[in-house]
Amino acid sequence: MQKTARAGDFKSFLKRFFSIFFQTLFWSSAVLSSVYNISCRISAEGIQILSGDYESPKILSIVAESEKKITVSLSEEVNVIGLTLSRQSAVLSDASAPMSGGESGKDVFPASLYAACGVENLVPISIESEEGGRLIICNLAQPTEIGGRYVLYGEIEDKNGNTLTFSSPVIGFNPRAARVVFSEIQDRSTEKGGVEFIELYVLEPGNLSGLVISSANDGKDYDVCLPPVEVDAGDFVVVHLRNSGDGCISEYGDDLELSTAQGSSSSRDIWIVNTDSRLGSTQDVLLLEDSNRSLLIDAFLYTKNSKTQWMKAPLEEAARRAYESGVWKSGFSIDNAFKVAGDSMQCIFARKNLSALDSAAESGTLPAGGISVVPEDWERKTASSVTPGR
């Protein structure tokens, strides 16, 4: 009886096994037949794509609004999982740091991220959100240093659970931006070792941090961001757009005799690390912007007489911006630019109304915002009369 019972159990097991096996085989065949055709290649028929939101939220902008406020604008409503702000250490900025517990040379990641995670130089912040969660406001417990380098590290999540982890550089806000204007421009040098330069004149004292020089001929990738340097009214700052040879030393402190390269001035020299020409040889639109306030403060448009239109779309766009901002008063077409006559390959321009602007600054009558300018405020100079830094 025991053998019979065991035999019955085994038969019952086999019956259940084959029943499940054939049901599985049937449904598997049905599914596979809708996906595979006779050539065994995958067919689009029978494949169903499930709908849903699988994209991480996007950061539209990160802006230092003031010394104690940073805003993060986003593409959609998010929940902040965590945010930290840290001062980027000069020691760590160009190296890699080990993870906690990691051996030397192993488990390393960028030092800026190491600092931003709050391990070092942490700046305490409190977080608010506006615009339905699409704007994050970081209120800092202490002010950032003018021109200081910081890293904002964070993790955010949208309503569908999609997350984004990011690390972004932040430059310390400058509430005391110096009031400066273009004063002399050389698009190229005919002397051996000479380079292009843009000279700035300081109308009101302050710090240069956040001031940006751009050439529409060159593009945004080559914007010149001025360093955090204190300047006084009446100072000249010569920005050399190429470094060529020895002695190209930028003068960030009080010693203004460090720069000894060809074209160095007796005033403050700043050298841009670059070996290519920057300014347009036939036409260009130069803009000077205070990025701390998103304010255009000066502009200069020039073109060879032979040109009847802007040669690149970015030139026309920059010219339009200069005009619509109220800085370049005469218009934005090629006819409204400063005209360069003759066939000379070198263009040197000098501002003629510096004395009037200086007097207005001293008397407190200089208008707020950008300085209005027209082509007649400028003149062309010869190579023998170029005077960078004076």
Task: Label each region the model flagged.
Residues 1-38:
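Sec-dependent bacterial lipoprotein signal peptides
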Residues 128-132, 228-233:
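Short proline/glycine- and polar residue-rich coil/turn motifs
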Residues 70-74, 78-86, 135-162, 282:
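Extracytoplasmic/surface-exposed domains of secreted proteins
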Residues 41-73, 162-218, 275-283, 294, ...:
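A structural motif detector for short, solvent-exposed N-terminal "entry" segments of globular domains
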Residues 77-125, 211-213:
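Short, surface-exposed alpha-helix to beta-strand junction/turn motifs within ectodomains of secreted
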Residues 117-119, 215-225:
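Short beta-strand and strand-turn-strand segments in soluble, beta-rich domains
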Residues 37, 143-147, 228, 235-390:
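Solvent-exposed beta-edge/loop recognition patches
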